[in-house]
Amino acid sequence: AERLDENSPEALALNYKHDGASVDHPSHAAGQKCINCLLYTDPSATEWGGCAVFPNKLVNANGWCTAYVARG
């Protein structure tokens, strides 16, 4: 799989960013990032991993989008 492009239509639709710390969005809270999201399919992937929202794409472990769901 290839890395998700922040400027792709699907990424833009969900306000996806590779660096969650730089996100300026009303839904974003500190500490939220792909690696601790329920939709991140491989929590052991610490740099880039799969996401249920973006099939066949890799998202950054420190990324964020509006589909974020806290794990656990």
UniProtKB/Swiss-Prot annotation:
Alphabetically ordered keywords of this record: 4Fe-4S, Electron transport, Iron, Iron-sulfur, Metal-binding, Transport
Single GO MF annotation: electron transfer activity
Nucleus found in the keyword field: no
GO BP annotations listed: aerobic electron transport chain
Binding site for [4Fe-4S] cluster: C34, C37, C51, C65
Highest taxon above the source species: Bacteria
InterPro entries: High_potential_FeS_prot (IPR000170), HIPIP_sf (IPR036369)
Stated family: Belongs to the high-potential iron-sulfur protein (HiPIP) family.
Protein name: High-potential iron-sulfur protein isozyme 1
Organism: Ectothiorhodospira shaposhnikovii
Gene that this polypeptide is encoded by: hip1
